């Protein structure tokens, strides 16, 4: 099995090294293409206004000046030689990708690009990393078995699997739950205003560590309960009930003011 791995934390990220070790347990044909610099929050951005530079680090390892989406597209079309990857793994992200965050995640976007190119794709993230020295031990302990089982089972061609690991001792993690995407009832993103040495204001965008109250069956609830969450996602954002509702009210001749 040929595996391509990418991430959004950058080529030197500890999570990418962890994913290389995970992939090595599943195959001896592992390729890496990841951003030269951190691209967290890049979502499905493409680099269109400037050229993308590629740095070859090894026979099967590359970094690029582009986004995770750029990396996957370049790897599949240009850099991975001989035949296409059989599986794409994106991560392991430093911090969970849950609920509405998946629409901003470069990690999930890398997997979506793989899916769009016809490669079965899995995004992997681990909760936590609020303190120095935290490791990817939970992901490294459980990801190989989960990935192997998912590959054996298969999944629809238009689906990306979003896997999130809790950040707690391995011996306390005893369950995998297949979940739906949740939605927070609190706002965790915020802008922090600061002032530079010249008296000019600037901002850092960040996240508050505030928990919501998600219902059972969601990715958020599973992680809060210390479970591994596996969420099938797809790129079709259509809200079918709203389509059916609006068809009866807006279809036909365009309305006038």
From Swiss-Prot:
A divalent metal cation binds at residues 8-9, 40, 93. GO terms for molecular function: 3'-nucleotidase activity; 5'-nucleotidase activity; exopolyphosphatase activity; metal ion binding; nucleotide binding. One of its GO terms (cellular component) is cytoplasm. It is found in: Cytoplasm. Binds 1 divalent metal cation per subunit. Its cofactor is a divalent metal cation. Its EC number is 3.1.3.5. Its main location: cytoplasm. It catalyses: a ribonucleoside 5'-phosphate + H2O = a ribonucleoside + phosphate. The keyword Cell division does not apply. InterPro entries: SurE, SurE-like_Pase/nucleotidase, SurE-like_sf. The keyword Nucleotide-binding applies. Keywords: Cytoplasm, Hydrolase, Metal-binding, Nucleotide-binding. Coiled coil: none annotated. Nucleotidase that shows phosphatase activity on nucleoside 5'-monophosphates. HAMAP family: SurE. Belongs to the SurE nucleotidase family. This is 5'-nucleotidase SurE. It comes from Phenylobacterium zucineum (strain HLK1).
């Amino acid at each position: 099995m040929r595996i391509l791995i990418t991430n959004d934390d950058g080529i030197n990220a500890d999570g990418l090294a962890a994913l290389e070790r995970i992939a090595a347990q599943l195959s001896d044909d592992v390729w890496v293409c990841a951003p030269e610099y951190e691209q967290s929050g890049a979502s499905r951005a493409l680099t269109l206004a400037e050229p993308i530079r590629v740095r070859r680090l090894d026979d099967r390892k590359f970094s690029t000046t582009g986004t995770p989406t750029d990396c996957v597209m370049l790897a599949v079309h240009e850099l991975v030689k001989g035949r296409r990857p059989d599986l794409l793994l994106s991560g392991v992200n430093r911090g969970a990708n849950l609920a509405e965050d998946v629409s901003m995640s470069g990690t999930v976007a890398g997997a979506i690009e793989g899916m769009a190119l016809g490669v079965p794709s899995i995004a992997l993230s681990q909760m936590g990393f609020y303190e120095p020295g935290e490791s990817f031990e939970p992901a490294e302990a459980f990801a190989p078995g989960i990935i192997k089982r998912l590959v054996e089972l298969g999944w629809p061609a238009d689906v990306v699997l979003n896997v999130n690991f809790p950040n707690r001792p391995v011996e306390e993690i005893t369950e995998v739950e297949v979940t739906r995407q949740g939605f927070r009832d609190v706002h965790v993103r915020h802008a922090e205003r600061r002032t530079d040495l010249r008296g000019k204001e600037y901002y850092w965008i960040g996240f508050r560590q505030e928990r919501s109250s998600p219902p059972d069956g969601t990715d958020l609830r599973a992680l809060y309960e210390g479970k591994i969450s596996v969420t099938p996602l797809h790129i079709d954002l259509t809200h079918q009930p709203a389509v059916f509702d609006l068809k009866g009210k807006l279809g036909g001749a365009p309305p006038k003011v």
